[in-house]
Amino acid sequence: MRVRIGLTLLLCAVLLSLASASSDEEGSQDESLDSKTTLTSDESVKDHTTAGRVVAGQIFLDSEESELESSIQEEEDSLKSQEGESVTEDISFLESPNPENKDYEEPKKVRKPALTAIEGTAHGEPCHFPFLFLDKEYDECTSDGREDGRLWCATTYDYKADEKWGFCETEEEAAKRRQMQEAEMMYQTGMKILNGSNKKSQKREAYRYLQKAASMNHTKALERVSYALLFGDYLPQNIQAAREMFEKLTEEGSPKGQTALGFLYASGLGVNSSQAKALVYYTFGALGGNLIAHMVLGYRYWAGIGVLQSCESALTHYRLVANHVASDISLTGGSVVQRIRLPDEVENPGMNSGMLEEDLIQYYQFLAEKGDVQAQVGLGQLHLHGGRGVEQNHQRAFDYFNLAANAGNSHAMAFLGKMYSEGSDIVPQSNETALHYFKKAADMGNPVGQSGLGMAYLYGRGVQVNYDLALKYFQKAAEQGWVDGQLQLGSMYYNGIGVKRDYKQALKYFNLASQGGHILAFYNLAQMHASGTGVMRSCHTAVELFKNVCERGRWSERLMTAYNSYKDGDYNAAVIQYLLLAEQGYEVAQSNAAFILDQREASIVGENETYPRALLHWNRAASQGYTVARIKLGDYHFYGFGTDVDYETAFIHYRLASEQQHSAQAMFNLGYMHEKGLGIKQDIHLAKRFYDMAAEASPDAQVPVFLALCKLGVVYFLQYIRETNIRDMFTQLDMDQLLGPEWDLYLMTIIALLLGTVIAYRQRQHQDMPAPRPPGPRPAPPQQEGPPEQQPPQ
């Protein structure tokens, strides 16, 4: 009985297994008919140890296979093709060949380009582009077999890994992708025109392309166009439109947009001023890596603007920016930027601003064409570095240096060597040619050539590395005062290259190079003071040096752009650019922005806000040591511009300008306040003292001081009269005791002598006058021509 029951159970189990196998086979056939690209289950991907990753449509593998090409095994010439078999079964056959098949040969490995799927989606819509799978084109993708319902289709197939998969894109995503491709093309076209031409008409055309790209939400184009609208660069100035773009960029996480929005809130342009919001946006911009935001935060922490003053925080921000600036320094040097102060230019019209007049430039060009070597070298340097009203132009610099070098000028040879050593679009980089020019210049004793030759031996450019020769040439250049030689000597002593490490010698040569204005010398000194290497650590000194380096970055070129805008009469564009640079800590920009606001030349600032904003920037410029700004602060408090009248505060600012900068104007003002008793007790003697000090401090103050002293004498006399009783003075006066008992006779004699002298002088004057001549006959009146008189009838 038990045996029968066991057999019955066994028979039932066999029947159930057969029924299950039949249903699985039918399901597999149905699935194969629905889609030939569907995997039977998600386990086929999950079970692989070398599963790949798909990010934004790009394929990333964790295996050792190449990203660009994958080695796949070629299919056999004929695959078993039966109507009920699925693609998965074919793949399984190829992945696991029958070991018992003796005729089976290992497939040969071939190289095929890896196709990449375009974008991705998880929405489940069918894709609308043909894709390749097993060398066949298909028009559909499917989400079958995926728990997340995401579309997938194979773009290439790896028979070992079975895991290279791409995602299809929807029609909407495809349209967006095509739009972004068009926007990128517009952006690249605009940037090519913008960087390749100096003509304003072509730059305006470039911004038309950038505007089209910006309208398609191209991030970089939006950044360019928004700043152009803010500054009025080749586009009409529109602060509101710029603000809207900055807000859009900020929502997308653009550091440039965040920094610009912080600037608008800090300056109150297009929005209500809010230093708190400005600080937030500046912080986000800095976290995103924007260097201008780091500069702004560095200055704010250094000066304590809106935050607690912190030297270490300022050092962190400034050092980060200085690292970028120092790494961007080239051998030939960047463009030269003049820091022109508008108040000084107005107060002293004859002052040399450093800008060359067009007539003078043309005169030098005329001399250079006539063969004047000095003019050729001078123009070459002007065009190499730019500045002083001359645009940077390496082609012209190369041509002028060539002319002078052919004439035997060592300076021109050395600069040609620098241009070849650095390389550019105009001059191809060539160590051999650079070495040739450096040697010729060094043999003639030129320090620039000696320094260049030292660089060649130091870094092995065209020659074998030789530290002894490098040290020799750097010393020769440094002895002649060439800053590059001094800098490199300092670096060799600092790092112990070719010499024994000596921080004192390094500090000495870095100081010498910094006196010549070398940016890297400032940078190296800042590093030494920040770390306390060779010197006592000084955060304050390090911050000041790093700040100096940061202000030599490429963004400093906007100082000249703002100055040119001011000279062209575009005061709104000038003041906005100066305000942005003022936020970065440029003292020149702070004083110039305050000056434009003080003159009420910018219409974008309301009349009620002009003086308060000017006062703010005068204050920041004064804290950086600008004398005129300190005197302006005294004037604003004296007259009540942008603040209440406060004579005591005005007196403090004048005294600071007098003691720290020895300003004659401040001394004169202190004398006046002592004379009038404004903000301090009246003291005529101290007033005279300050007037005298002003006359000694400046020859220009002598005439005003003389007039002030005359007035002071009258004031002193009147004050003496008020304090003295005149009647009592004459009553107490004893003439007999003062002049003697016969003082009246002396007085009468003196009066008689004076009268006699006057009478004699008048008589002599009368005798010297010539006698009057008798009047001559009167001339006859001119005859009038007319008709003859008619005789009366008789």
Curated annotation (Swiss-Prot):
The residues forming the signal peptide are: 1-21
SUPFAM superfamilies linked to this entry: HCP-like, Kringle-like
Task: Relate the outcome reported for changing G585D.
Answer: In NEDGSAF; uncertain significance; results in impaired function in ERAD pathway and decreased degradation of endogenous and model ERAD substrates; decreased interaction with ERLEC1; decreased interaction with OS9; decreased interaction with SYVN1
Q: Cite the residue spans of the region called Disordered.
A: 21-50, 64-109, 766-794
- Positions with biased composition (Acidic residues): 23-32, 64-77
Show the segment(s) annotated as Interaction with ERLEC1, OS9 and SYVN1: 22-737
Task: Name the predominant localization.
Answer: endoplasmic reticulum
SMART domains registered for this protein in UniProt? FN2, SEL1
Q: Which UniProt keywords apply?
A: Disease variant, Disulfide bond, Endoplasmic reticulum, Glycoprotein, Host-virus interaction, Intellectual disability, Membrane, Notch signaling pathway, Phosphoprotein, Repeat, Signal, Transmembrane, Transmembrane helix
Q: From the UniProt entry, list the residue stretches annotated as the region Interaction with SYVN1.
A: 643-723
Q: Transmembrane region positions?
A: 739-759
Which residues does the record list as glycosylated? N195, N217, N272, N431, N608
Q: Where is this region: Mediates retention in the endoplasmic reticulum?
A: 738-794
Spell out the post-translational modification annotation for this entry: N-glycosylated.
By its UniProt entry, which InterPro entries does this protein fall under? FN_type2_dom, FN_type2_sf, Kringle-like, Sel1-like, Sel1_AlgK, TPR-like_helical_dom_sf
Disulfide bond annotation, renumbered to this chain: C127-C153, C141-C168
Q: Where in the cell is it found?
A: Endoplasmic reticulum membrane
> Subunit arrangement?
Homodimer and homooligomer. May form a complex with ERLEC1, HSPA5, OS9, and SYVN1. Interacts with FOXRED2 and EDEM1. Interacts with LPL. Interacts with LMF1; may stabilize the complex formed by LPL and LMF1 and thereby promote the export of LPL dimers. Component of the HRD1 complex, which comprises at least SYNV1/HRD1, DERL1/2, FAM8A1, HERPUD1/HERP, OS9, SEL1L and UBE2J1. SYNV1 assembles with SEL1L and FAM8A1 through its transmembrane domains, but interaction with its cytoplasmic domain is required to confer stability to FAM8A1 and enhance recruitment of HERPUD1. (Microbial infection) Interacts with human cytomegalovirus protein UL148.
Q: Which pathological condition is tied to this protein?
A: Neurodevelopmental disorder with poor growth, absent speech, progressive ataxia, and dysmorphic facies: A severe, autosomal recessive disorder with onset in infancy and characterized by developmental delay, absent speech, intellectual disability, short stature, microcephaly, facial dysmorphism, hypotonia, and/or ataxia. Neurodevelopmental disorder with hypotonia, poor growth, dysmorphic facies, and agammaglobulinemia: A severe, autosomal recessive disorder with onset in early infancy and characterized by general developmental delay, intellectual disability, absent speech, severe axial hypotonia, short stature, and microcephaly. Patients exhibit agammaglobulinemia with no mature B cells, resulting in recurrent upper and lower respiratory infections and early death.
UniProt lists the family membership as follows: Belongs to the sel-1 family.
State what this protein does. Plays a role in the endoplasmic reticulum quality control (ERQC) system also called ER-associated degradation (ERAD) involved in ubiquitin-dependent degradation of misfolded endoplasmic reticulum proteins. Enhances SYVN1 stability. Plays a role in LPL maturation and secretion. Required for normal differentiation of the pancreas epithelium, and for normal exocrine function and survival of pancreatic cells. May play a role in Notch signaling.
Name of the protein this chain belongs to: Protein sel-1 homolog 1
Write down the species: Homo sapiens
